[in-house]
Amino acid sequence: MDENIIINILRKEMMPGLGVTEPASIALSSAKAYEVIGGEIKNIKIIADPGLFKNAFSCAIPGTKEVGNEMAALLGAICGDASLGLECLRKIKKEDVSKAKTMLDKIDIEIKSQTEGLYVESIVTTNNGIGRTIIRYKHDNIVLVEKNNKILYQKENTLNKSNNFSQEAIDSKKITEMKLDEIVEFVNNVNYEKIEFLLESIKMNKKLSEKGLEGLGIGLGKLILESCNENNYELYAEALTCSAIDARVSGATVPAMTVTGSGNHGIITTLPLLAIKEKKNLNNEVLARSIALSYIINIYIKEFSGKLSAFCGCAVAAGTGVSAGICYLLGGSLKEIENTIKNMASNITGMICTGGNLACSLKANTGVKAAFLSAKMALNNIVIPNKCGIVSNSIEDTMKNIGRIAYPGMMETDKEILNIMIESSK
């Protein structure tokens, strides 16, 4: 495959995001809908797919102590800046939060069950009329903008049901046409200057981690770091990862570099690699190459599991990606990278997702632990053999199988998780 296609996919899948991407997507949608209509807000209606609704259900809004779909939508309309994309709530103020709290009776949330892929629609009614937006397939992909039933903007071929979802999704799908040996060949041989941009994710996510080490969230990252000695890069990796996620899900106003639409995925696919790099005094080039491998494997799996799913994509998809990156950084061969992925597939695949919340760092820690264990096993010639569980004869089919566990495998599980969350909130 043309290396420029791979590089473009990596660039496309990377994006700064403030807070968890699902409430950010809701806020962006309502911000844009209000932007086109203006005036005094009378009502806001949000229609979201179950996965997006679940992920935003109990997640903190950046810069506030508030959580959930309703507050995300209200704040988007009240103070959101749609031009900032997933950082649309960057300018939030205390008075905006106070105003939103007085307007909770003006918002309605509807779950759109019969839809494929990510979906969020905002209908903002004011004294000036109605503003409406639809976001599809990607968290910031606005495909429709209307003002008083007049279409102001519409992306072609994105409102119809399609197995390929959108042109952007087709691009990333090309990753799944590659064999693992082709992926590793790209990682080894691509000109370093062409992938140096991947290090931007390290700078951004490290700042978030430093914020989390102040004890935000459940304080898991801080707790782990306290028991970490100077040369233990595994515990250091867990601490960096968990503290960044602790900060993110608790509403810290520091952006993460998202990948495949998720800040947590972006954190897990990068920070464990930074930990190894720092403790072993490796250079930036080998770090960038390991990130490229980590990202590509994560993207590969996510193309089959979907952007949002019943399993914890952070621990499973991103965790598998970073396991390959860990093996690579520790000098692993192509065969050892393959065996690392087999070991991951056999371990935590199926861990459930209960949305973006304070428990995310706990699941992330499990994913990072499993990633290091899988790599160490492979580097010591220990591997789960083919035809054992979901491990297939080819590593490509094995990665596909990981995704299949989520979609279609766990669709009913996802519904029940959402039912439990809604019942528990009453």
UniProtKB/Swiss-Prot annotation:
Domain of life, per the record?
A: Bacteria
Q: Name one GO biological process term.
A: L-cysteine catabolic process to pyruvate
Query: What transmembrane ranges does the database entry give?
Result: none
Show the GO MF annotations.
L-cysteine desulfhydrase activity
UniProt record similarity statement = Belongs to the UPF0597 family.
HAMAP family annotated for this entry?
Answer: UPF0597 (MF_01845)
Q: What is the protein name for this chain?
A: UPF0597 protein CLD_2825
UniProt lineage: Bacteria, Bacillati, Bacillota, Clostridia, Eubacteriales
